[in-house]
């Protein structure tokens, strides 16, 4: 079925998604004020973790083998982590795509990963954690076989959890509302649920060692902790924050206790023996920056489009995480589908009943597919048109609409616009958070109103020490170009 391109240019159609450095800088200024206010007042954002900044950067080198689990929005990972202490330059140069410099102080063993199915997300908490316990037991059993007699009777366990929680101590936490498709209620004891789940698989016998929970942290907190361990601070460099952009989007940064509302200051903070807990002590804070408290700047600066509103209205918890709907892997594919469908039916006047079924099904287009679209990213099929014909196949009936090169290029423009906006917004949030934590300072000059996208606008660092954020690169796989664009926006905005 032939199509005729509407005279309306795609750049005009996609104008609501357009951003430039001036708009991103304005967002950074506004988010900085919002973050400062949320730290001082919100009970569901800027959640404290009882870990001081000094503990993040100890003078000594930890060593040993530990059990670790990562409960994410999409996958569960379980494995043993070996801390190697002082880097060994003779260690093998590559593994899992990482360089020696990136992994020289940590080695992973017997790691396994399982997808968290939609059915599990809708089950009772006890069912979900019984399944998690079974997976843990499987890896522990493998450890017993790999190192017979070497594992202790009680294995220390560290837990990374990709959801909001109230942290009472380093090893005790209460779940808040989970989001990301999970229907589990809040106010549940995470450690208790996990131990009970493992004991069900252990069967109360001595065949498998017991586990002891020694640390529970949010995944963004864990990112910062692991980065601080991997890359020791120097007079010219330190780990400043942890950033997650995957199924969800979140960050962690050390903040002074004085910036937090008194009710959010932990009763006991883990500090070095030489320290006391003063108001100027910084602790790791899980920002949960995508929750509704940060929606104000997005609305005031017209970042939220009609497509975003439709996506949010059809989501699991409308209005709960507006920033996440615009930046995270769980939602960007669906956002693209909504935009593509509108253009085809409204601008090109194509009957939706003749379109590929995946375009009319909710979540029919994945973020992974949309992110890999394009000749510069495709490894197996350089033709943009053939990528779409294969990934979003047309109906087989005669008279059904077919992809054309012109429409394929439009879809690529949509994917790119979504990616660029997500990268710019995340960069603005990163800069805003660094400023909120006094790691950098905004210049006194007002934000420019008509700067081009390549014009640089610099902020002043709080000291002459270079700050670094740790990014889970593997989480960028759904949108391979996002990391590069995020880095470029940060460099343009921050002047790195």
Regions found by a protein language model. Give the residues of each.
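ATP-binding/phosphotransfer module of carbohydrate and carboxylate kinases, centering on a glycine-rich
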Residues: 1-109, 120-153, 230, 304-496
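Short, solvent-exposed loop/turn and secondary-structure capping segments
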Residues: 79-81, 90-91, 169-172, 254-256
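Short glycine-enriched loops at secondary-structure junctions
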Residues: 82-84, 159-165
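Glycine-rich phosphate-binding loop of actin/hexokinase-like ATP-binding domains
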Residues: 87-93, 180-187, 225-337, 341
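Glycine-rich phosphate-binding loop and adjoining helix at the ATP-binding site
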Residues: 113-133, 165-233, 239-241, 259, ...
């Amino acid at each position: 079925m032939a199509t005729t391109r509407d005279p309306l240019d795609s750049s005009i159609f996609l104008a609501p998604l357009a951003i430039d450095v001036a708009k991103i800088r304005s967002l950074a200024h506004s988010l900085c004020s919002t973050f400062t206010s949320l730290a001082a007042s919100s009970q569901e954002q800027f959640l404290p973790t009882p870990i001081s900044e000094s503990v993040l950067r100890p003078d000594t080198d930890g060593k040993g083998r530990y059990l670790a689990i990562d409960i994410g929005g999409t996958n569960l990972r379980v494995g043993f982590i070996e801390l190697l202490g002082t880097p060994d330059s003779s260690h093998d140069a590559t593994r899992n795509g990482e360089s020696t410099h990136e992994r020289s102080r940590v080695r992973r063993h017997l790691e396994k990963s399982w997808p968290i199915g939609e059915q599990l997300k809708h089950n009772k908490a006890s069912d979900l954690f019984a399944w998690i316990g079974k997976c843990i037991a499987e890896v522990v059993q493998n450890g017993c076989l790999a190192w017979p007699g070497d594992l202790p009777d009680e294995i220390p366990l560290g837990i990374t959890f990709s959801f909001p929680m109230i942290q009472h101590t380093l090893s005790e936490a209460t779940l808040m509302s989970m989001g990301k498709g999970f229907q589990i209620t809040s106010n549940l004891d995470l450690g208790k649920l996990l131990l009970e789940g493992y004991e069900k698989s252990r069967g109360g016998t001595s065949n498998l060692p017991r586990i002891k929970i020694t640390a529970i942290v949010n995944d963004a907190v864990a990112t910062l902790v692991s980065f601080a361990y991997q890359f020791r601070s120097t007079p010219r460099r330190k780990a400043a924050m942890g950033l997650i952009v995957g199924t969800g989007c979140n960050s962690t940064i050390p903040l002074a206790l004085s910036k937090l509302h008194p009710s959010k200051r932990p009763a006991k903070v883990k500090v070095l023996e030489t320290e006391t807990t003063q108001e100027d002590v910084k602790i790791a804070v899980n920002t949960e920056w995508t929750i509704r408290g940060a929606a104000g700047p997005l609305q005031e600066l017209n970042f939220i489009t009609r497509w975003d509103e439709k996506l949010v209205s059809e989501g699991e918890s409308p209005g709960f995480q507006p920033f996440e709907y615009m930046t995270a892997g769980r939602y960007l594919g669906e956002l693209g589908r909504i935009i593509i469908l509108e253009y085809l039916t409204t601008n090109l006047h194509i009957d939706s009943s003749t379109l590929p079924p995946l375009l009319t099904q909710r979540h029919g287009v994945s973020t992974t597919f949309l992110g890999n679209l394009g000749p510069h990213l495709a490894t197996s099929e350089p033709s943009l048109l053939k990528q779409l014909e294969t990934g979003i196949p047309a109906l087989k009936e005669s008279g059904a609409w077919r992809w054309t090169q012109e429409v394929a290029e439009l879809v690529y423009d949509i994917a790119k616009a979504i990616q660029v906006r997500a990268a710019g917004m995340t960069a603005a949030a990163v800069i805003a958070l660094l400023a909120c934590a006094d790691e950098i300072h905004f210049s006194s000059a007002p934000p420019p109103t008509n700067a081009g996208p390549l014009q640089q606008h610099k902020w002043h660092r709080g000291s002459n020490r270079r700050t670094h954020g740790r990014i889970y690169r593997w989480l960028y796989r759904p949108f391979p170009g996002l990391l590069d664009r995020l880095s470029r926006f940060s460099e343009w905005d921050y002047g790195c």
